[in-house]
Protein backbone atom coordinates (compact mmCIF):
# COMPACT_ATOMS: atom_id res chain seq x y z
CA UNK A 1 0.00 0.00 0.00
CA UNK A 2 1.17 3.47 -0.82
CA UNK A 3 0.47 5.46 2.34
CA UNK A 4 0.79 9.23 2.26
CA UNK A 5 2.07 11.34 5.11
CA UNK A 6 0.95 14.74 6.31
CA UNK A 7 1.63 16.40 9.62
CA UNK A 8 -0.17 14.28 12.23
CA UNK A 9 -1.86 12.08 9.62
CA UNK A 10 -1.14 8.97 7.55
CA UNK A 11 -3.68 8.14 4.88
CA UNK A 12 -4.52 6.23 1.72
CA UNK A 13 -6.17 7.71 -1.37
CA UNK A 14 -8.09 6.15 -4.23
CA UNK A 15 -7.36 6.94 -7.89
CA UNK A 16 -9.54 10.07 -7.66
CA UNK A 17 -7.40 11.46 -4.83
CA UNK A 18 -10.11 10.88 -2.23
CA UNK A 19 -9.16 9.73 1.26
CA UNK A 20 -10.28 6.14 1.75
CA UNK A 21 -8.43 5.37 4.99
CA UNK A 22 -6.57 7.37 7.62
CA UNK A 23 -5.12 7.50 11.09
CA UNK A 24 -4.72 10.87 12.80
CA UNK A 25 -2.38 11.65 15.67
CA UNK A 26 -2.26 15.28 16.87
CA UNK A 27 0.85 16.30 18.73
CA UNK A 28 0.31 16.91 22.45
CA UNK A 29 3.90 17.65 23.44
CA UNK A 30 7.32 17.71 21.80
CA UNK A 31 7.70 13.92 21.71
CA UNK A 32 4.15 12.73 22.27
CA UNK A 33 1.05 12.32 20.12
CA UNK A 34 -2.53 11.23 20.68
CA UNK A 35 -3.80 8.61 18.24
CA UNK A 36 -7.36 9.85 18.18
CA UNK A 37 -8.96 8.57 14.98
CA UNK A 38 -8.77 5.63 12.60
CA UNK A 39 -11.02 5.44 9.55
CA UNK A 40 -11.43 3.00 6.68
CA UNK A 41 -14.04 3.44 3.96
CA UNK A 42 -16.88 0.95 4.61
CA UNK A 43 -16.40 -0.80 1.25
CA UNK A 44 -12.78 -1.62 2.23
CA UNK A 45 -13.34 -2.82 5.79
CA UNK A 46 -12.29 -6.32 6.72
CA UNK A 47 -9.17 -6.22 4.52
CA UNK A 48 -6.66 -5.35 7.26
CA UNK A 49 -6.16 -1.77 6.12
CA UNK A 50 -6.60 -0.25 9.59
CA UNK A 51 -4.07 -2.74 10.95
CA UNK A 52 -1.56 -1.70 8.29
CA UNK A 53 -2.19 2.00 8.94
CA UNK A 54 -1.59 1.73 12.68
CA UNK A 55 1.48 -0.46 12.16
CA UNK A 56 2.84 2.11 9.70
CA UNK A 57 2.27 4.78 12.35
CA UNK A 58 3.89 2.70 15.11
CA UNK A 59 7.02 2.17 12.99
CA UNK A 60 7.11 5.91 12.19
CA UNK A 61 6.78 6.83 15.86
CA UNK A 62 9.52 4.41 16.91
CA UNK A 63 11.87 5.70 14.21
CA UNK A 64 11.29 9.28 15.38
CA UNK A 65 11.41 8.56 19.15
CA UNK A 66 7.82 9.69 19.65
CA UNK A 67 5.48 8.15 22.24
CA UNK A 68 1.75 7.77 21.74
CA UNK A 69 -1.31 7.73 23.89
CA UNK A 70 -4.39 6.33 22.24
CA UNK A 71 -7.91 7.65 22.61
CA UNK A 72 -9.10 5.88 19.47
CA UNK A 73 -10.59 2.52 20.49
CA UNK A 74 -9.08 0.75 17.48
CA UNK A 75 -5.59 2.01 18.36
CA UNK A 76 -6.02 1.02 22.02
CA UNK A 77 -6.93 -2.53 20.97
CA UNK A 78 -4.17 -2.64 18.35
CA UNK A 79 -1.42 -1.77 20.83
CA UNK A 80 -2.81 -4.29 23.35
CA UNK A 81 -2.52 -6.97 20.65
CA UNK A 82 0.96 -5.90 19.49
CA UNK A 83 3.24 -5.93 22.54
CA UNK A 84 6.26 -5.62 20.25
CA UNK A 85 5.35 -1.92 20.08
CA UNK A 86 5.05 -1.34 23.85
CA UNK A 87 8.03 1.02 23.61
CA UNK A 88 5.88 3.38 21.50
CA UNK A 89 2.62 3.27 23.45
CA UNK A 90 2.15 4.97 26.82
Where are these regions (language model features)?
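Conserved N-terminal entry element of GNAT/NAT acetyltransferase domains
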Residues: 1-5
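Acidic/polar N-terminal loop/beta-strand segments that form early-domain functional surfaces
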Residues: 28, 36-38, 71-74
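C-terminal structural segments of small proteins and small subunits
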Residues: 56, 60-90
Amino acid sequence: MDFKYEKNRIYLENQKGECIAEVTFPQISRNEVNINHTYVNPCLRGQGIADKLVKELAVYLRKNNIKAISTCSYAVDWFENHPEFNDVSK
